[in-house]
UniProtKB/Swiss-Prot annotation:
Lipid-modified residues, S-diacylglycerol cysteine kind: C24
Membrane topology reported for the UniProt record: Lipid-anchor
SUPFAM superfamilies referenced in this protein's UniProt entry, alphabetically: Periplasmic binding protein-like II
Organism encoding this protein: Haemophilus influenzae (strain ATCC 51907 / DSM 11121 / KW20 / Rd)
GO MF term list: peptide transmembrane transporter activity
Protein name: Putative binding protein HI_0213
Record-level GO BP terms: peptide transport
Amino acid sequence: MNNLFALCQRSAVIFSIIFTVVACDKLDSPKPISPQIETQKNTQLESNRVELKRGVYSDLTLQPWQAQSEEQTQLLRDLFEGLTAYDVQGNLVPAVAENWQTEDNKTWIFTLRENAKWSNGEPITASDFVQSWQTLSQSESPLKNYLAFMNLKNAKAVLEKALPVESLGLFAENDRTLRIELDKASPYLPSMLAHVSLLPHYAKSTEIFISNGAYQLQRQAENQHILTTNPYYWAKEKVIFQQVKYQKISVDADLSDFDVVMNPKKVNQNIQDYPQLCTYFYEFNLSDPVLQKSAVRKAIVSMISTNNLVADIAHLYPNNTFLPKSMLGEQESVWEPVVAEQLFSQNQISETRPLKLRIRYDDLSLNQTIAMRLNHQLSQSDLLRVENQGMSWQELQTARTKGDFQLIRSGWCADFNDPAAFLNLFYSKSPDNKNGYKNAEFDRLFESAMTTISEKVRLENYAKLKGIVQQEHLVLPIFQYSTPVYLVPSIMGAQVNSVGVIYSKDLWRKVQSQ
């Protein structure tokens, strides 16, 4: 919308469910306003639209490789832009790269925008990305491991100092063409490139801070970073706020002076929950002679109400599927009647031969609460004998490694927004497959999804893979994590998305004239 303040249209556009609808009817015979009052009012309105205030609880960093929290990444994404990024709905979109192509999902060609520039006016080149990632590989940052995680060719050997940094699969064919070579087919590479660790770094020595995002650093103090618009940003005409202030605050701080705060500590109003790409679940021991039967797992899952497990716990989304809801598409779970006792009976489980279940979990408060409620729901059946066993995190990992459990607390978070990040846990050749699940059809579909360059075929395979996980009841899903975000009602442009990203460049303020 070019005229962002022309809101008095009778349209069906919904900006956000938390925003108040303001009546747009014209007033009859408006009273004249003195020029002095009019000028004062307009000055105040324009001032409100100029600056965005964001509160943060952690120390901020200007180095993407040093990011340790979501708060820190928000500042970095305002200052820098990678090859790809996200829109307000969490969809992947071109950023510095205007397009990309591949013929085998292993060798990728990215074409950079001709008008992509640093904040000093210099063009951003393919060599900038090559140098940035090479430097990352030689740093002490744990984020350098992301290069190997994204399957960048020779990354593992380079990180281990077995090969020189020039061996990384990165090539600047010319200023605007970047070739990326991978060790194995990865159709989701563009999604992985939106990660904060891959943001470019200005390599030349300079007295001022140089960035390439929608904003540039104007000044910084101990607890404050002031950003102003980057005059050379390729989409500068879409940036509304001229200034963004990041202010470090205490846990007891009054948030009324701020527009956006992630993970607010003591506020319950004006909160939006942004679902994370993280799921909380219990693993079945698939080597257990009874639990290796899918019918038994199905019976157990059917006894659980995830809504009741997390009903009074804030910022958790009950989830009946292993994958985050944003990855399900139209494949939402369908309820079907299940008689658990009948399935148990068919598998020689009875009151005289009950199934003994040990629920193992690390003894944090949330985990204890979930385990207690889980025990209560399962204990409704006379065919089950349920025992809770809380332990330390390290003891839990030891039990998992030894297979010493029936049900064990688990979870998984993805670094990129693609179903493969979760489905990979059940691919038999994956190092992330810890439960020993092996299914030839699952492996075939997964490998086909990785190698095909047809998005249609890949999505069809993903749907089939999701179906197998669901039908086999490979895990007992509980909930999906979310990040609470404080947003004042006047801030527009923010939409709940699955990647938890709120770019300041996408926001604007609705100010009602008085």
